[in-house]
Each structure stands twice: as structure tokens, then as C-alpha cells.
């Protein structure tokens, strides 16, 4: 019998070309079962493209679930909505996080990190601005050359100015930030096409916005991977990711962030799940969806 306070893992994802927010849950971090009969709990209506891709769900201390997502292939805004129960949702909004950058081509895969030291939320995403980092202007698909940017907020109503979050000297998307004791881990996709990388790497820092080490070697294998999401399970890090050319979710596991074992054959997700994000949460907050 699972108790209300028992920790479980909640996985948010999309299917198809961006049909909306899907959820799955797991007690062991390996086998995820779809909630709501694998139907979207929310579909995108914000923005001209009305997409909802790469949904990231943050179960905040204010009692709400805060959701951000990629609202379109193009544009300078991200999608945002909140919910107390994952059933009833606020009106969807477009947050114009790159509105000040007229040449910005996109805003992809936003995520939320809660900064406990400053009691604020950090929203970060990948954008490509032509000519901003000329040394890698021709390294990506269709001339895209991404770096990571961020804003901060305490209430999801007012936001700081947009700042550069991470520039590792290469084309990067799909970063995910987690805290490990007193240090920060930044898992990311090396989006370089020439020469082909398309893999997941990790950088480490003792401070939140600067000081990240050069990312280590790829932690994923001989396939294209994106959309990493990292959780700690029984003292070891599991990183889930989208093997998007193979149409499956993969995973690797490590106890030291150096040596990684591929456990893709041991994880199970709903068919068709794409670019998901996992968070640890109490069973009480999702049991009504079972």
C-alpha cells in the first residue's frame, strides 16, 4: 500500500507533432504508466502555431504545478499555464522572453528551476540569434546556432530581463539543471551537426550562473539523443532522453557522473512518448489521476 507521502516520479511528455501535455508515473523510476488513459491533459492554444511540445512541469511549493512548453517552431515566446491539480488549468499565456531580440528565431524546450537560496524561479530555454556567436554560425541545422538564456520570477507575473545562461562555445539546446548537494549539474544536448554530435553531455558548477566546467564526453551512445531529464534514484543518477531517430525513450545511470551504464532496455514508457521531463513528487499529489 503506497502512502500519501511516498515519493514517486512524474513524467511529462508530448506525442506526435505537439498534441499536448501527457503524464505518466513510476514508483521505481524504471517503469512509467500513462495517466488519464494517455490522453492529453492540456492542449496548446497559445500562439499562432498552437503547439505544445517539450512540456516541463514544476510541482512548486506554492501548491501549484507550473507548466512551460515550446509553443512553436518559430517565435520569441514560450507557453505557460498553472494548475492546482493537473485537471483545472489557468488560461494559457505566451511569455515573450525573447521579445527584445528582434532577430531571435525561436525559443525551445523551456524548463523551470527553483532557486532555494534566493526564493525565486529560474526559467531557461534555448534560442538562436543569427550572428550572435559567429564562430559556430554554420554548425547547426538550417543555420540555427543556439545558446541557453534565462529569466527569473517569484510569481510568474513579473520577470527579470533576459540574460545569457550558458555558452559552452558550441551549439546547445535542451539543457536541464539540477542541484546535487552544493553543486549544480547541467545536462544538455550538443546540437552540433558539422561534425555530427547530437548527444548528451554534462557540465558542473559550484555556482548557479557561472563557473560551469567544460562539459565532459557524451554520456549517450552511438545514436542521436535529445531532451535529457535527470533524477536521483536510490543514490544514483538516471538520465532519461529521447532517442528521437529511433522513436523511443532511453536512459543511462551513474553513481559518480563519470561512468555511465545504458539501461534503455530496462526502462518502459508509454508508446510514442517524446521529450519528457521527470520530477520526484509525493504520491498524494497525483493519486487522484490514477
Annotate each predicted stretch with a short phrase.
Residues 1-290:
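Carbohydrate-active catalytic/glycan-binding domains of CAZyme proteins
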